[in-house]
From Swiss-Prot:
It holds the Pfam family ABC_tran. The keyword Nucleus does not apply. Residues 9-247 form the ABC transporter domain. InterPro entries: AAA+_ATPase, ABC_transporter-like_ATP-bd, ABC_transporter-like_CS, ACT-like_dom_sf, MetN_ABC_transporter-like, NIL_domain, P-loop_NTPase. GO terms for cellular component: plasma membrane. This is Methionine import ATP-binding protein MetN. One of its GO terms (molecular function) is ABC-type D-methionine transporter activity.
Length: 341
């Protein structure tokens, strides 16, 4: 059992170069037991390379990685893959199933390889357990060719977790799935975290999934961490233009309204229960400003609803500054969008 107060993953000043080309640069972060951490970024930003470093598939040029008790202080080729795979599991979008084996045989295979002392009865018990968890028990004797894309991906995750790992690394595992299958897989990943306490690192370009699943998120750009923090804070108050672009917020505001000289476009973020509409009414009644609500929505972050409004704030500069300050004092996250050029 790992100490809940100590990181189960610790990365310090990680660098990776291939043929004198910098892939990763000074990457540092920690993941604590039970967290689901997302990694987002444009194609080529280094997300998958970082995940492969965490899985000890490639050795960093410099820096250190500690994951589930394994450390890069030892050359990775000297680390037992069998022992490593019992604690750290890796799933990619390709699934990697044996086509000539049934669903049951695919899931049982790693147990037979990694745990030769395990009895046939115990193997069957563990495989049946994950089959029931993923609602695949009725498909246990089916071959991969008879499965849907979503079912194949769930089998791949079942293979990864049947050995009871402490960490699950997921690389774009929903990218080839239809929306219904994606939702099913994401729900199972969340359930794995809640019921079995499996720490997860989730690489994805699908922002809605990251918002739903991940408590913390790393934003990568050109091999470096551009920004990191609680996922909802990155969404509500991004500090980086890259983060803002990935969450599509600047384009949303520009597409809604082109503001005038004495107007500002604001994005107001607020948790459930904060009566932001009443606050806006009070500000308008105070005089000197007008607030036009342009759009609004509710987003779920790990089942916690957070809302936002995009508004046009009009009035003199002093009155606008007072209105923004008043909203912030009441707990509203205020994000100002730059005027289009």
């Amino acid at each position: 059992m790992f100490n809940q107060n100590s990181p189960i993953i610790s990365v310090e000043q990680l660098n990776k170069e291939i043929a004198n080309h910098r892939i990763l640069h000074r990457i540092s972060f920690s993941v604590y037991p039970g967290e689901i951490v997302g990694i987002i970024g444009h194609s080529g930003s280094g997300k998958s390379t970082l995940l492969r470093c965490l899985d000890f598939l490639i050795e960093p040029t410099s820096g250190s990685i500690s994951i589930a008790g394994f450390h890069t202080s030892s050359p990775i080729e000297k680390i037992s893959r069998t022992a490593f795979a019992k604690r750290v599991a890796y799933v990619s979008q390709s699934c990697g199933l044996f086509l000539a084996k049934t669903v049951f045989e695919n899931i049982a295979y790693p147990l037979k390889i990694r745990c030769p002392e395990m009895t046939k009865a115990l193997i069957e018990e563990k495989v049946d357990d994950v089959l029931h968890f993923f609602n695949l028990y009725e498909r246990k004797h089916a071959y991969p060719s008879r499965l849907s894309g979503g079912q194949k991906q769930k089998v791949a995750i079942a293979i990864a977790i049947v050995s009871d790992p402490r960490v699950l690394l997921c690389d774009e595992i929903t990218s080839a799935l239809d929306p219904r299958s994606t939702e099913d897989v994401v729900d199972k990943l969340s359930q794995l975290n809640e019921e079995r306490g499996i720490t997860q690192v989730f690489v994805s370009h699908e922002i809605e999934i990251v918002k739903k699943l991940c408590c913390q998120t790393l934003v990568m750009h050109q091999g470096s961490i551009e920004e990191s923090g609680p996922t909802e804070q990155l969404f509500l108050n991004p500090q980086s233009a890259i983060t803002e672009e990935l969450f599509h917020m600047q384009s949303i505001a520009k597409g809604i309204y082109e503001h005038g000289e004495n107007e500002e476009i604001l994005r107001l973020g607020f948790p459930k229960g904060l009566a932001v509409q009443g606050m806006i009414s009070q500000l308008i009644q105070s005089g000197g400003i007008s607030i036009n609500i342009l759009s609004g929505d509710i987003h779920l972050f790990r089942k916690t609803p957070l809302g936002f409004l995009i508004v046009a704030l009009s009035g003199g500069k002093e009155q606008r500054d007072w209105a923004k300050s008043s909203l912030r004092e009441k707990g509203v996250i205020v994000k100002q969008f730059q005027k289009s050029r």
